[in-house]
């Protein structure tokens, strides 16, 4: 599956206690579970899915999240750009598939083992979370992050070598992105 890199990483994070993983085979069910969790907690909840029509199956929950201003984060695996439009399996056009229903769309480049990737990924994820919770004057709501993966999609049994930079984050826990909180509006003011 195109989302195998997500599956392996999420399973490892769940085992380490860094997150609680809820696995659903049906994408619609996964999206509506995440929608309910986000609606109840008022915190962003991610939904990871594979490529192709699986992404379209999330559309109902994305629309509900948009109309109800619920911070839902859609993270979809995708084919790399060079395999799009070639007739390859599961090459549904996922770029901006949710249109105006999402507060922000971003597509990352295919992952590469080189310095600087950690900062790029963390910055993009921080900006997506900020958009989902409505900072910077935006309305709270769903966002979509599309991530193309090249093969191999499963981890190597023998790694190539260490990652070229620390994955620990910034010194002292400093954020990757600083966002200004939205100013509350008076009742009746738009």
Name each model-derived stretch.
Residues 1-190:
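N-terminal alpha/beta PP-like core and its mobile active-site loop of ThDP/TPP-dependent enzymes
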